[in-house]
């Protein structure tokens, strides 16, 4: 029995959920999100509670049970609080700034890197060494943060690059003479 899957998902005030077939749609103050569950699980809404049940006893049904419940929980969290990733830029001359819908990154290359922000995500730069990514889709927010970090991942000798806020960078000692 799935310890995660058997717990129902509570709907906070101001959030509505509907199920049509295998598609769960959640509406809240931060927008609307939907998720298509696999045929191995049954999703139902009872008042302000969403419950997910497996359709059989197969291993795949039990695997999908916990995953589907977590996906529904992420829909509810996304439309109420949203998701947020913070990046820190470390290095001499490394900086970021927003220009309309484009994040302009100076990362020590011979040219600036222009990153176009996709729909459904907002990117802000409170300081030129900080980038904040927010949205109601956890997967999209994380993917955008990973794509930005990929341009200059932190290196282990000086720690220069783009890192997640609070991320520990394993440091190495340089060569000895």
From Swiss-Prot:
GO cellular component, one term: cytosolic large ribosomal subunit
Pfam families: Ribosomal_L6
GO biological process terms held by the UniProt record: cytoplasmic translation
GO molecular function terms noted in the UniProt entry: rRNA binding; structural constituent of ribosome
UniProt keyword terms in alphabetical order: Ribonucleoprotein, Ribosomal protein, RNA-binding, rRNA-binding
InterPro entries: Ribosomal_uL6-like, Ribosomal_uL6-like_a/b-dom_sf, Ribosomal_uL6_a/b-dom, Ribosomal_uL6_bac-type, Ribosomal_uL6_CS
Lineage: superkingdom: Bacteria
TM spans (from-to): none
Family from the record: Belongs to the universal ribosomal protein uL6 family.
Known role: This protein binds to the 23S rRNA, and is important in its secondary structure. It is located near the subunit interface in the base of the L7/L12 stalk, and near the tRNA binding site of the peptidyltransferase center.
Subunit description: Part of the 50S ribosomal subunit.
Name used for this protein in its record: Large ribosomal subunit protein uL6
Organism: Jannaschia sp. (strain CCS1)
């Amino acid at each position: 029995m799935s310890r995660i899957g058997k717990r129902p998902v509570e709907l906070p005030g101001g959030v509505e959920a509907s199920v049509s077939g295998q598609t769960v749609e959640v509406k809240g103050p931060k927008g609307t999100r939907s998720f298509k569950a696999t045929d191995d699980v049954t999703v139902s809404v009872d008042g302000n509670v969403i419950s997910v049940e497996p359709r059989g006893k197969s291993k795949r049904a039990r695997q999908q049970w916990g995953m589907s419940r977590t996906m529904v929980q992420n829909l509810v969290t996304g439309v109420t609080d949203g998701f947020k990733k913070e990046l820190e830029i470390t290095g001499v001359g490394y900086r970021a700034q927003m220009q309309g819908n484009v994040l302009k990154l100076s990362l020590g290359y011979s040219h600036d890197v222009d990153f176009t922000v996709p729909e459904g995500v907002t990117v802000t730069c409170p300081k030129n060494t900080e980038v904040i990514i927010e949205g109601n889709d956890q997967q999209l927010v994380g993917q955008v943060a990973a794509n930005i970090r990929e341009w200059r991942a932190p290196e282990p000798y000086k720690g220069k690059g783009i890192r997640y806020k609070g991320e520990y960078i394993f440091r190495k000692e340089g060569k000895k003479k």
